[in-house]
Amino acid sequence: MNYNKLAAFPENFLWGASTSAYQVEGAWNEDGKGPSVIDARDSYPEGTTDFKVASDHYHRYKEDVALFAEMGFKAYRFSIAWTRIIPGGDGDINPKGIEFYSNLIDELLKYKIEPIVTMYHFDLPNALQEKGGWSKRSVIDAFERYSKVLFEHFGDRVKYWLTINEQNMMILHGSALGTLDPNLKNPKKELYQQNHHMLVAQAKAMNLCHEMLPEAKIGPAPNIALIYPASSKPEDVVAAFNYNAIRNWLYLDMAVHGRYNTTAWAYMKEKGYTPVIEDGDMEILRSAKPDFIAFNYYTSQTAEASRGDGSDEAARGGDQHLKTGEDGVYRGSANPNLEKNDFGWEIDPVGFRSTLREIYDRYQLPLIITENGLGAFDQLEENDTVNDDYRIDYVKQHIEQIQWAMTDGVDVFGYSPWSAIDLISTHQGCSKRYGFIYVNRDEFDLKDLRRIRKKSFYWYKELIASNGASLN
C-alpha cells in the first residue's frame, strides 16, 4: 500500500543499538566470572579469534557509553553474562559481577540512555552444560533463580527485559553453539526437549518479573524472517507455511499464547521430536504474558516443496553454511529477486516491513527491533576514517521500512541495530564488523583496541537527532 504521507517516529522512540556480553566484554575469567559454553570451546573456525578479550568493553565501558551518548542513543540493548553473576550457573552470587553491571547501568542512566537487558544470549554456564544443560529440567529452576537475582539487583533501574536471545536459532542450529551433544542418536528430539525447557523457563521468568517488578516490561527476542514461497505453485506455498510455523511462529505462539501451533506439533510428531511435557507445564506457559515482542531481523528466507529424495536438508550457502531444509517438510531456496552481501546474506528491506506487519497482526503487541545490521570487511583508512556507506545504505533502507510499517498501523517503539560497536562475530571472528564504532584490533593482534568513529556513526547521530526526519 502506498501513502501520501508517512507516519513520523514518536517523540519517545527508543533509538539505540545492541551488543552481547560474550562478544563485546572480554575479561572472560576476571573478577570471579565462571566459564560459559562459549569459553569452553576448544576450537574456532580457521583464522578466527576467540572471545577472551573481544572488544574489552569490561574495562572500557565508560568510554564506550560516552560514545553511545555522543551518537544520541536513547537506549542500549546489552546482555548480562549469567556466569558473571552466578559463576556456576546456580548457587553463589559473584559480587564483582553485580558491581560491574550495576556500574554499567548507572553509567547509561547518567546519559539518559535506557538500558534494555537481555538475560540470556547463547552463553549458558558451562557448569550447567556439563550436567546436561537445557536437556535437564533442573536448568529451568536455575534460570528462574538467576532471573530473580537480576530483578532484585537491577530491577529498580531497568524497565525493559528480554528473556532469551534467538531461542529459535539455538534450536534450529543447536550444534553451532555448543549446547548439543553431537553423538546423540536423535539430536533433534533432544533439541526440541531443550526448547520446551527454555519455553517453561522463559514463562517463569516473565511471571516472576511481573510479580517482582510491576512497572517493568518483559518479552521474548527471537530471530524472525519472512518466508517466501519459491513460486506460486501450491506445493511451494505449503512449504513456506511449514517453514514459517517451525522457524518463526512455534516460538512466538508459545511465548504469547502458551500453545504449540498445530503445524509445528504435527511436524514434531511425524519426526519423533515431541518433547516430554510434565504436569503443570502448559498451565505455566499459558499464564505468562509478554508485554511486547522484541525480534532480530537480518534477511528473509525462501522455501520450496520437498523433493522427497532425502536431499532437502542441505546447506544453502552463506557465510555460516546453516542448513535451511527439513526432509519431507520444506526445502531452502535462493531468492533471485534479492541482492546478496559479501557474506551471502540476501538483503531484503521490504521483507522487513512485511515481517513487522505479520508479527503485529498475529500478536497485537508493541514491537522493538533488537538486531538488524550489516556485517562487512570494514577498512581503516588514512586519518582514522572508515567509509562504510554500504552500512549506512542498509540501515537507512530498513529504517525507512519501519516508517512504512508504522504508517500501516504497526506499533513499533524502538530500533537497536547490531551493533553499537565492533565485536566478535559468533562464526567469523572480528573481521566481520557490524558496529558504528571501529575497534582497532585484528583476529590475533589486539593492537591498541582504540575506538574510532565510522562514517555511519555520524550518519546515525544525525538521524537520531532529527528523530528520523533526516531520512527524507
Language-model segments: residues:
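Active-site region of glycoside hydrolase catalytic domains
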Residues: N2-P45, A69, G88-D90, I98-N472
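A common structural microfeature
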Residues: N12-L14, Y58, A75
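Active-site mouth loops of central-metabolism enzymes
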Residues: E46-H59, W134-R137
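Internal amphipathic alpha-helical repeat/solenoid segments
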Residues: H57-A66, P87, G97
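Catalytic domains of carbohydrate-active enzymes, especially glycoside hydrolases
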Residues: R60-A81, A288-F292
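Glycine-rich, proline-tolerant flexible connector loops at the mouths of alpha/beta enzymes
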Residues: I80-I93
